[in-house]
Amino acid sequence: GERLPKHVKNISAEGISHVKLIDASPIGINVRSTVATYANVHDELRKIYARTADAKNRKYKAGDFSYNTGKLRCPVCDGTGQISLDVQFLPDVDVPCPECSGSRYGKEAWQICYENKQGERYSLPQLMEMDVNTALLATSDLKLVHQRLQVLKELGLGYLTLGEETPSLSGGEAQRIKLATELSRRSTGKTIYILDEPTTGLHFADVHKLTEILHRLSADG
């Protein structure tokens, strides 16, 4: 590891397995990083859609549902949901893709649907356009997906859409999504979490929600 500063002789952290910094720095550096991908929801949804009859009939695999590299991504914007316009004498302007209207997916992806226990059918592009609160209702019988979305809701992020670009999130939103991801992971030992001003800019109700989540982290070790 790195050499200790001269004024530090020794660091003892007996029983501590990990130290993790959860700050307000931006998540991701480009538009391909979304709330669903960072919260580990999108990969699970791709597997679920690959098991549907619609996908099997068309011989699509989980990888085909990736908007980054899959066969079902929009052929015009290559899954970014936007295109750049060359404006003379001015910086390029990014606008929603005219082919997929910003959904990132090609037309066939909209035809492959998952049917929940309520008999409602949704395509993956439809789910990605939903906010967390709405997606919770649509995926109530998908245990792992529902659990991860529920954590986002409990952190006061139910208004975010699954397809929202993470670089565009505020510092407070980014920090809470990082917390949600930690809560969704299986515990692998005692962990110290270092948070950088986690309540800055939060409403009192959201501060209360955050405090409850921190108590849960503490209880998990």
Where are these regions (language model features)?
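Conserved phosphate-binding elements of NTP-dependent enzyme cores
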Residues: G1-G221
